[in-house]
């Protein structure tokens, strides 16, 4: 993260807030900001080969989408996700949105809330469907399934149940592959008594506390 780059905020503003929602490229150097992905994360040395997941940034990459001429948050951009990330660069891994982009926006520009930039007029379910259609697999920070279920129903009406089921199963496959890579299905069984002894035990807590103290940087 963050696709397609996180260092181009207008006037250096923070995209967590609505006043920092725009990423700008006054010198036309958009392609330069893709290099950490296209020349590194997507071509790793060793067996990993490619990053397993990508997170689009909150920002509206202003003026980048010449195809559809839409200025919307990166996860909502068909051009940035479907055409570039999934299409041109053939990324097969998980696309997980930045945290909290589907809920309705804050009432004030300085509010620290949802970042549904460029798609404020849509319902939450419609926003979810747009992102899913673009190629998003996972919604960062979301804990309610209702909007996703509603998005699925809208998608069935719009694209057909077969197409929507295939699309949802593709995301499920991508997510499960990462879990398989962690070995969680090869040895999923636990000994409850052993777990009770080691989880949160005094020794581990002591080591954790010491590690945190050593990580502190004083300025």
List the predicted regions and their residue ranges.
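Glycoside hydrolase catalytic-domain context in secreted enzymes
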Residues: 1-219
């Amino acid at each position: 993260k963050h696709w397609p780059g996180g260092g181009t905020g207008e006037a250096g503003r923070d995209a967590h807030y609505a006043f920092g929602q725009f990423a700008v490229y006054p010198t036309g150097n958009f392609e330069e900001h893709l290099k950490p992905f296209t020349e590194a994360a997507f071509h790793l040395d060793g067996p990993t080969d490619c990053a397993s997941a990508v997170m689009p940034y909150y920002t509206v990459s202003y003026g980048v989408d010449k195809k559809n001429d839409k200025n919307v948050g990166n996860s909502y951009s068909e051009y940035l996700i479907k055409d570039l990330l999934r299409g041109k660069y053939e990324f097969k891994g998980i696309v997980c949105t930045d945290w909290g982009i589907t809920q309705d926006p804050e009432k004030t520009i300085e509010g620290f809330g949802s970042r549904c930039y460029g798609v404020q007029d849509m319902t939450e379910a419609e926003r979810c469907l747009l992102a899913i259609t673009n190629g998003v697999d996972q919604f960062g920070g979301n804990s309610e399934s209702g909007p996703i279920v509603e998005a699925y129903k809208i998608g069935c009406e719009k694209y057909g149940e077969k197409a929507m089921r295939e699309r949802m199963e593709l995301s499920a496959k991508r997510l499960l592959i990462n879990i398989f890579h962690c070995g969680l299905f090869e040895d999923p069984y636990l000994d409850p008594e052993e777990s009770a002894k080691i989880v949160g035990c005094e020794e581990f807590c002591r080591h954790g506390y010491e590690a945190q103290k050593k990580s502190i940087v004083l300025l």
